[in-house]
């Protein structure tokens, strides 16, 4: 195994040697590494002076410093990203890819060698820049942040560098020109910049424990992207693909066949298209055309067949993901309940705070607007948000939001116990009436997101990244439209017509409903 990794290191050494010879790569990295830390040191000193001038606390200044460390580490990586973007497609344009691909190295050795070469230089430059920034703080007599903050920023810089470089390598393998690869780089830089903004908010509020979770989450996404590249990298594809063609017809046909289980389009759609054509050209009459009623009956029968065949088949494929997601949800509820319950000593709260907590618990279930359409739209937005986050993170961020939703249930039950309300009563009256429909819906959509991420990084012979994404997306949409949306409709009606009056009746004496 060590010898096999040594062969990959040969590619890494070759790439590093080429990079060190190219002044167009070295010059921007050297300038940014030397100038940017100095600029951030001046910015840190200016920010602290400004805060002190208006009587601000030193805590604000110290919370800004770790964010500037992230910024110092981020910008050199964005410049060095061009090396990773040209890893394969650049060699293809220069005509040097054939000798590399005809070497006796395995596909994973070629890919891993390029990945290591693309990671070492940006990470080294980032750490050098951070070191210069810390040295500048010391020269300006600015106190360093706490060690745990420094460790977190260094870890975040490392995992974000791997994330950006691994995504750039995947883009390089799928692009046909360097120009196309550079244009796609914005899909790497912009999300990471937004991620850094979110991390800066966590730093400002001093949530160190959550920052470690952010490190873990980004590391998992990085590993999944590396896995994605390794699974779908085939050297023959680099030479066989000369031009990119966006075939929307093929995309739709592939998606529709996977979604519906049939190549045929809905008969109602074909009927309306035929009517529209006949209006434009009365001569176009199809004697075999079905009437509107016949098309409706046949499509209704097809929907029943779809529910009887396709939905169970999809759920069977997702069975492992469903069980894992269910276990994660139960664990989140129990963990949150135990954690919240252990934070408060019985009898330590005064009656006024207990009454405020009781009112807050009531509003958490009763809410302000409990109309079915508002509740349905709120739940749809939540599940669409989970789906969007999951699609762009291989399911990781979607599962994180899912854990937060289920942890909220455990926290509410524990809070009910603390303020003197029976957790079982709260569960039966305030959550379960609509929860028996809403919770399975969020479990299924989260399972579909997890399944989508796993499918993308699982090798399937003869299937490209695009095909794997279309098939997985079809399964996700199938579950969402076929099961989750109907469940959310029922949940919204039950929550509005049953949960609200039941909860008001049983807890009206303890929780005034306004």
Which positions does each model-derived feature cover?
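Terminal transmembrane helical anchor/hairpin motif
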Residues: 46-51, 144-148, 175-246
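Transmembrane helix boundary and interhelical loop/hinge segments in multi-pass membrane proteins
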Residues: 80-101
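Selective transmembrane-helix segments that form parts of the transport pathway or gating/packing helices
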Residues: 75, 80, 105-135, 326, ...
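Hydrophobic alpha-helical transmembrane segments of multi-pass membrane transport/permease proteins
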Residues: 19-47, 67-80, 124, 188-199, ...
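Interfacial/capping segments of alpha-helical transmembrane domains
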Residues: 44-53, 333-361, 502-509
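A structural motif at transmembrane helix-loop-helix junctions in multipass membrane proteins
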Residues: 20, 24-27, 87, 142-190, ...
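Aromatic- and glycine-rich beta-strand/loop motifs that create alpha-glucan
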Residues: 1-32, 242-246, 250-320
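Membrane-interfacial helix-loop-helix connectors in multipass membrane proteins
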Residues: 47-64, 131-158, 206, 414-429, ...
């Amino acid at each position: 195994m060590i010898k096999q990794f040594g062969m990959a290191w040969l590619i890494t050494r070759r790439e590093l040697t080429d990079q060190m010879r190219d002044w167009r790569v070295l010059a921007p990295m050297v300038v940014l590494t030397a100038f940017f830390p100095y600029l951030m040191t001046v910015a840190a000193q200016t920010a602290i002076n400004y805060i002190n001038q208006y009587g601000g606390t030193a805590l604000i200044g110290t919370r800004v410093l770790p964010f500037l460390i992230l910024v110092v580490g981020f910008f050199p990586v964005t410049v060095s990203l061009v090396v990773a973007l040209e890893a394969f497609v650049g060699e293809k344009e220069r005509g040097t890819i054939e000798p590399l691909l005809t070497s006796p190295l395995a596909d994973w050795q070629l890919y891993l060698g390029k990945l290591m070469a693309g990671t070492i230089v940006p990470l080294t430059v980032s750490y050098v820049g951070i070191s210069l920034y810390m040295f500048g703080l010391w020269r300006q007599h600015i106190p360093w942040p706490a060690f745990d903050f420094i460790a977190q920023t260094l870890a975040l810089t490392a995992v974000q560098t791997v994330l950006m470089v691994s995504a750039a390598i995947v883009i390089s393998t799928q692009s046909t020109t360097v120009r196309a690869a550079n244009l796609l780089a914005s899909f790497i830089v912009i999300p990471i910049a937004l991620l850094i903004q979110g991390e800066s908010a966590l730093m400002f509020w001093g949530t160190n424990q959550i920052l470690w979770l952010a490190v873990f989450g980004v590391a998992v996404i990085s590993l999944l992207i590396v896995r994605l590249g390794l699974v779908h990298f085939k050297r023959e594809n680099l030479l066989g693909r000369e031009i990119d063609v966006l075939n929307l017809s093929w995309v739709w046909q592939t998606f529709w066949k996977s979604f519906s289980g049939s190549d045929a389009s809905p008969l109602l759609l074909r009927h309306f298209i035929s009517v529209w054509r006949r209006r434009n050209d009365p001569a176009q009459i199809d004697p075999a055309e079905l009437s509107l009623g016949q098309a409706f009956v046949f499509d209704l029968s097809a929907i029943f067949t779809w529910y009887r065949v396709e939905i169970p088949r999809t759920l069977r494929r997702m069975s492992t993901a469903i069980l894992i997601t269910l276990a994660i949800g139960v664990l989140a509820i129990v963990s949150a309940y135990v954690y919240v319950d252990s934070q408060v000593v019985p009898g330590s709260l005064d009656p006024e705070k207990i009454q405020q907590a009781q009112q807050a618990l009531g509003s958490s279930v009763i809410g302000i607007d409990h109309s079915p359409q508002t509740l349905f739209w709120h739940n749809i937005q939540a599940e669409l948000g989970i789906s969007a986050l999951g699609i762009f993170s291989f399911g990781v961020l979607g599962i994180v939001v899912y854990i937060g939703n289920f942890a909220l249930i455990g926290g509410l039950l524990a809070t009910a116990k603390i303020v003197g309300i029976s957790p079982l009563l709260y569960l039966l009256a305030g959550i379960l009436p609509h929860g028996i429909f809403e919770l399975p819906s969020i479990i299924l959509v989260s399972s579909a997101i997890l399944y989508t991420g796993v499918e993308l990084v699982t090798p399937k012979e003869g299937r490209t990244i695009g095909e794997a994404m279309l098939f997985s997306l079809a399964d996700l949409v199938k579950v969402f439209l076929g099961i989750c949306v109907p469940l959310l409709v029922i949940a919204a009606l039950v929550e509005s017509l049953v949960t609200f009056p039941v909860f008001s009746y049983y807890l009206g004496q303890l929780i005034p409903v306004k």
